[in-house]
Amino acid sequence: MGIGATAGVAAVGGLALNAQASGEGAGSGGSSSSEALVFDQDGYSTLTTTITDADGADHEVTYHFYKAITYVARPVDEKYQSLNISVPVTIDGKAVDATDAPILFANSVGGYMPSSVADATGVGGGGMAGGRGGAGGASASAAPSASAPSGGTESGSAGQVSGGKMVSLPRLGLAAGYVVVEPGARGRTLKDAAGAYYGTAPAVIVDLKAAVRYLRANKGRVPGNVDRIFSTGTSAGGAVSALLGASGDSPLYDEYLKEIGAADAGDAIFATGAWCPITDLEHADGAYEWCWGTNALSTGEQADQTVSKQLRSQFAEYQAGLKLRGLNGFGPLTARNYDEYMLKQYLQPAASTYLGGLSDSARETYLAAHTFITWDGKNATFTWADFLTHVGARKKDAPAFDLFAFPTDSSDTMAGDINNEFGTGTTQYRHFTPYSLRKDKGAGARLAGDVPEKLRLMNPMYHLVDKPNAGRSKHWWIRLGSSDSDTSLTVSANLAAAAHRLGDEVSHLYYWDQGHGANTDAGDFVAWIARTAGHRAQ
């Protein structure tokens, strides 16, 4: 039974919340996990919707909609610790048996903000609470245009775009015959009556793991194949999707999961989809300066180049320590050769694909406007310096993530977002790197004692590089716009290289001229799910 539900039919209307953010929830009495976390197979509404697929074709889909199911026995805040499930019944009038269909597990986290499905009235209705973006919206064709698109969403958005239109993976997945699960999760801005933050790290990943455990504990009751869970997310949601995949069944989270009454089941997932993941946070400042350090700000001014140089040096040391090798036999990845790797492995192929998809006249127009590109009729080539000039202004100042000085306007929820993610108690912002901490507080300052553990809990690279996790996802779909300066282009590339080194299947590419939140091959991802899961469409 979930919030707003009655026996037999989930209430799509109003919502009776039982938020226990004052601290009464965790560790309090109540139903045992086994009693509270049994999926009610009859608790659905039957809905019908028209979904436009990635090729532009419309499909009438009738589905069972299970609304706002609380997935833990001792919730801190049910508004966020609940999930929706959508199960296809008929597609274009043809009956669908989704008993063993893949499960698309689509989070709508953005900016590490809270996300809720409590007010959703159907599939794709989840979204950030009090923030921008969401998982909803119509799908769009991925056909390229002649102009240089800068398509994308705002920083902190969980939305995806293609051709200027919103993309909804939950809706596309449902139209493909998959079971769609949309989990809510706590986020960094949530405060109780005493002003204490209860959604900061590691709450978001703990909640997503608890949602997976709920599904696995209800194997045979929940429709769909719980051994074929495909996680998706964008921006911070892409980061936690990658983290969910990398950290499957890790014992590091057990204490947190026990505290909220998570089901006694595993939390490993089969495959991970991550779009523009804002991750590897403790190393993101250095990576950002390596990538975008010489690009001017939108004001035309340069970021502090002394700071930028110091952070680039940190990145070089970090990158060398990873001991990663590039895909396709490139060899060791270092700060010295990463530009060459980005060009050969990702950026030039991305430009080639884009140009190859244009009509002859559109291609001629584009190349005339972008003379830095050499085109031989099949392949595009250019230099790293010219690519940086093409992208233009960097989106963030230096340092990009762990700010030297915290914001004074607490109403701006995106300023100091990562410092807020590592806040605790009534402290809104905290440093999470020694470099920024010491710039702010002095050379002798030390990180708070709990921060290193929380960094490990929030970083997929820990589970792929530092302590390779046997329970991780073995299938990865990673995407990023080439013009996305919300984080460094190396972040996704390192994630892909780390998973590839462990023998995992990795599909990773960049969308040419696209910004933050781009998803121009959503149809390919939907097909990849079926192929990877071994699922045959009915």
Predicted stretch roles:
Residues 217-292:
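Primarily recognizes the serine-hydrolase "nucleophile elbow" in alpha/beta-hydrolase
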Residues 98-112:
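Short beta-strand element of the alpha/beta-hydrolase
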Residues 284-288, 329-376, 381-383, 477-484, ...:
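C-terminal catalytic histidine-bearing segment of alpha/beta-hydrolase fold enzymes
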Residues 198-220:
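Alpha/beta-hydrolase active-site loop
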Residues 2-18:
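N-terminal export signals
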Residues 21-100:
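Catalytic-loop region of hydrolases
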Residues 109-206, 245-247, 514:
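Cap/lid segment of the alpha/beta-hydrolase catalytic domain
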Residues 75-81, 161-162, 247-258, 265-266, ...:
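Mobile cap/lid helix-loop segments that gate and shape the active-site cleft of serine hydrolases
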